[in-house]
A protein has these predicted regions:
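Conserved PLP-enzyme active-site core in the AAT-like
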Residues: 1-103, 108
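Conserved C-terminal alpha-helix-loop-beta "cap" of PLP-dependent enzymes
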Residues: 104-169
Length: 169
């Protein structure tokens, strides 16, 4: 059984079922809504699996999205493609800039040709690297790396620390 968490790529960039996935998980809270307004998710699987395995749990546990929250996610889907395109372009610009920065040792972004899985990402993710990246700061040891990483976080002026991703805040 092949399960894929597609919350970073979303259906706008990657369709895991076409790549052989049996079950695909999507977070409606993150990119799909895009505004941080709901707690939602979707589990996509073959109809028989949903009927035989998931529906009994759903009936007993009550994990059903309210009509209003479903509507909110649907409204977010209307702008998903354009939001992800812009977010992915911005992430690529930032990744390129970080790759050249003297205080950065490594950038993790599948949209960069230097990424070891760049070709796979481009093939699977509609030719873009997505909207999320990470990087390592240059440091002599773990303590220095931690101190430098927190210095970067404390120096942010445009971005803020938050518990969600993919929304406009």
């Amino acid at each position: 059984l092949r399960c894929v968490d597609n919350c970073f790529a979303t259906p706008a960039l990657q369709r895991p079922v076409t790549l052989g996935a049996d079950i695909v998980m999507h977070s409606g809270t993150k990119f799909l809504d895009g505004q941080g307004r709901v707690m939602a998710g979707a589990l996509c699987a073959p109809e028989a699996m949903v009927r035989d395995k998931f529906l009994p749990v759903q009936k007993n546990a009550g994990m059903v999205l309210s009509p209003f929250n479903a509507w909110v996610v649907l409204k977010g889907l209307e702008t998903l493609n354009i939001r992800l395109k812009a977010q992915s372009a911005a992430a690529l610009d930032i990744a390129r800039w970080l790759e050249q920065h003297p205080a950065v040792s490594r950038v993790f972004y599948p949209g960069l040709p230097s990424h070891p899985q760049y070709a796979l990402a481009m093939r699977q993710m509609s030719g873009v690297g997505g909207a999320v990246l990470s990087f390592d700061v240059k440091a002599a040891d773990a303590a220095q790396a931690r101190a430098r990483a927190f210095h970067v976080l404390d120096s942010l002026q445009v971005l803020s620390l938050c518990t969600n991703l993919g929304d406009t805040k």
